[in-house]
């Protein structure tokens, strides 16, 4: 059987060790004679799963004690509404950094609840897109918070700086880059991330929120999106996505076994450098993102002759290189190389790219 590497942007590849363990435990979890999917979320057995998952995530990210960790539904799109309704209070304005597709999507949702101060930080130079340094961002004085997306999956744009905005409340959508390298959680008021890219399967959303920001929700906020309600109920205000929570917990343990986020950062940088190097080495392929803002997680690329795209994708698929088609709004190709993608998968892709160019260049 051909070795398969899944380059999907999400739902994304999971560590094979995690899948094997889940397979082994699927029908008889911990000797109970049933699946973890079938037990009560309030049972002592599942409570242990939940507690261990939170502890391991706190250890991995070094989350300070004055932050709550919530395991929620709804993905990042639910958080696009939850953030303003939890944090605006009496304010009518928040700063929204617009650096790509998902940042702009957050703006559109926030417009239902406030008047966002939209700050376009993209730069354009001879067809190459980048992001202006944070020191050039024109933040307002009276914003309730500053929202940005550190990694844009579609555009392949990354903001690699961490925020240093004094006392401003910083909110970050880390859906596609959480756990890919160490970050300083204390620089943020809220971090949120859909699980389906770098945490676990779709259906779970992780929210990390500083305790002093709880209890400011607007009255019209649905209880299921209220950070204070979720925190007071240990993320079990309603039945949570238990299987996704369990699998994410296995991923956290796998990350610790691999050496933690420092080690993952080294691996992810090496994978990205290998793939960008293959693209930059030739005129046959191109990436139109400024070097300083190239994503380690999502690498879009185009061929000089777009008529070859379909052939490239079909031949790649035949060799076990799956899900390389670019997003519908961007076209071309995109390789998502999250934590679970081994460097062998990236080497297989770059070898295929070189061979394809040899035959069609």
Swiss-Prot record:
GO terms for molecular function: O-phospho-L-serine:2-oxoglutarate aminotransferase activity; pyridoxal phosphate binding. The modification N6-(pyridoxal phosphate)lysine is found at residue 197. One of its GO terms (cellular component) is cytoplasm. InterPro entries: Aminotrans_V_dom (IPR000192), Aminotrans_V_PyrdxlP_BS (IPR020578), Pser_aminoTfrase (IPR022278), PyrdxlP-dep_Trfase (IPR015424), PyrdxlP-dep_Trfase_major (IPR015421), PyrdxlP-dep_Trfase_small (IPR015422). GO terms for biological process: L-serine biosynthetic process; pyridoxine biosynthetic process. Gene3D superfamilies: Aspartate Aminotransferase, domain 1 (3.90.1150.10), Type I PLP-dependent aspartate aminotransferase-like (Major domain) (3.40.640.10). Binds 1 pyridoxal phosphate per subunit. Pfam families: Aminotran_5. Catalyzes the reversible conversion of 3-phosphohydroxypyruvate to phosphoserine and of 3-hydroxy-2-oxo-4-phosphonooxybutanoate to phosphohydroxythreonine. Homodimer. This is Phosphoserine aminotransferase. It comes from Yersinia enterocolitica serotype O:8 / biotype 1B (strain NCTC 13174 / 8081). The lineage of its organism: Bacteria, Pseudomonadati, Pseudomonadota, Gammaproteobacteria, Enterobacterales.
């Amino acid at each position: 059987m051909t070795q398969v590497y899944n380059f999907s942007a999400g739902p994304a590849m999971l560590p094979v060790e995690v899948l094997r363990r889940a397979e082994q435990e699927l029908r008889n979890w911990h000797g109970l004679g049933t699946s973890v999917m079938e037990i009560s979320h309030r049972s002592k057995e599942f409570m242990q799963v939940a507690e261990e998952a939170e502890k391991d995530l706190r250890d991995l990210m070094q989350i300070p004690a004055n932050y709550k960790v919530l395991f929620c539904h709804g993905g990042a799109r639910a958080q696009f509404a939850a953030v303003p309704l939890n944090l605006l209070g009496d304010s009518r304005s928040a700063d929204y950094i617009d650096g790509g597709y998902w940042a702009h999507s957050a703006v559109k949702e926030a417009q239902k609840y406030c008047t966002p101060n939209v700050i376009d930080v993209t730069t354009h130079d001879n067809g190459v897109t980048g992001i202006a340094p944070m020191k050039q961002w024109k933040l307002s004085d009276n914003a309730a918070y500053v929202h940005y997306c550190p990694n844009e999956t579609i555009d392949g744009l990354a903001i690699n700086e961490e925020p240093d905005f004094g006392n401003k409340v910083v909110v970050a959508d880390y859906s596609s880059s959480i756990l890919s390298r160490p970050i300083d959680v204390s620089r943020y008021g809220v971090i949120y991330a859909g699980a389906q890219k770098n945490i676990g399967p779709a259906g779970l959303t992780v929210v990390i929120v500083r305790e002093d920001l709880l209890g400011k929700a607007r009255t019209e906020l649905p209880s299921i999106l209220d950070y204070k309600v979720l925190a007071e109920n240990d993320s079990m205000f309603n039945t949570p996505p238990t299987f996704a929570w369990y699998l994410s917990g296995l991923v956290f343990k796998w990350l610790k076994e691999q050496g933690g986020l420092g080690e993952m950062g080294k691996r992810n940088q090496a994978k990205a450098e290998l793939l960008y190097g293959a693209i930059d080495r030739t005129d046959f392929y191109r990436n139109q993102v400024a070097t300083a803002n190239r994503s380690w997680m999502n690498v879009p690329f185009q061929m000089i002759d777009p008529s070859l795209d379909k052939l490239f994708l079909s031949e790649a698929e035949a060799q076990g290189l799956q899900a390389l088609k670019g997003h519908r709004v961007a076209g071309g190709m995109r390789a998502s190389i999250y934590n679970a993608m081994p460097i062998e998968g990236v080497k297989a892709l770059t070898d295929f790219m070189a061979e394809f160019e040899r035959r069609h260049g």
